Amino acid sequence: MRFVDEVVIKLQAGKGGNGCVSFRREKYVPCGGPDGGDGGNGGSIYLKADENVNTLIDYRYKREYYAENGRPGEGRNCYGKAGEDLYLVVPVGTSVFDIDTNKKIGEVLQHGQTFKLVSGGKRGIGNTHFKSSTNQAPRKFTLGEEGEYKEVRLELNLLADVALLGLPNAGKSTLIRSVSEATPKVADYPFTTMYPHLGVVKVGVDSFVMADIPGVIEGAAEGAGLGLRFLKHLTRARCVLHVVDICPFNESDPVENYFAVEKELEKYSQELFDKLRFLVINKIDLLADKVEQKCQEFVEQIGYQGNYYTISAAMKKGTDELAKKLNEFLQKQE
């Protein structure tokens, strides 16, 4: 299924039903009083989060949504039926922005959570309500109000505990495949990963969610490559793993590659740049000898001071230990 993380849709809530003008007329009550019922309220439109949905693709092809109108009131004080509410099912982590103001107006972050997008129109009232001592046969009633209209943008930010960051072909997809059941495409060419992937990493009785996004290249902050569009999916991760290929097949410099990604991250968002990151040195199986020494030299060259991990995702070397360390870190954060 194609991954879609941003759509614009138009919403029209239901109109309230009109009130009714009616008078009681029965065989032995030829001049009964007013008995016009109220209309029904118009239906509203809600977002509803579903953990089993992972894309906004359904809203890419259908852009307009209408809730049901309320029914008009009837005689004998019968109220009109309220219009049914409409629920738009979206992935957990979906935010809503008003197109007119470009301001965020809401979000759904938990399974089953709802958020009202537009409110249905208020019902009209029947002539029964207008009876008084001076007006025993009122013909006054009110019309139902129009439902609210709004144009909104839905944005999906994936909810992951750990997010993977790095250049194309750094081995991020191989890593997420090696520690979870996720199956992103893996190949020896740039941008194998075209869309984000989520994988559940199980460590004993615990588990956490890992996200793989398309690789970041130089100029991503200005729109180059695929990384810019998907960098936003890192914002809600509890920590980020910067995956570096220690032995690139194109013979590029791992040090320069590391700083290229860090530079683009800082240009894109200072908030994202300040997020907690761990360094993962990948493809150590391609180093002929002195693996620990070469990794340590790399860490010193980039001036990295935090925790780092050396792995071979393809050979599953060090990946279980990495998963355990990440799980320990996440458990301490709760």
Curated annotation (Swiss-Prot):
Per UniProt, the keywords (alphabetical) are:
Cytoplasm, GTP-binding, Hydrolase, Magnesium, Metal-binding, Nucleotide-binding
> Where's it mainly located?
cytoplasm
Q: Where in the cell is it found?
A: Cytoplasm
GO MF annotation, one: GTPase activity
Q: Which Gene3D superfamilies match?
A: GTP1/OBG domain (2.70.210.12), P-loop containing nucleotide triphosphate hydrolases (3.40.50.300)
Cofactors named for this entry: Mg(2+)
Residues annotated to bind Mg(2+):
S173, T193
Query: Residue ranges of the OBG-type G domain?
Result: 160-331
Could you name the Gene Ontology cellular component terms for this entry? cytoplasm
CDD domains per UniProt: Obg (cd01898)
Positions annotated to bind GTP: 166-173, 191-195, 212-215, 282-285, 312-314
Oligomeric and partner information: Monomer.
Family to which the UniProt record says this protein belongs = Belongs to the TRAFAC class OBG-HflX-like GTPase superfamily. OBG GTPase family.
Q: By what name is this protein known?
A: GTPase Obg
In its UniProt entry, the species of origin is given as Francisella tularensis subsp. holarctica (strain LVS)
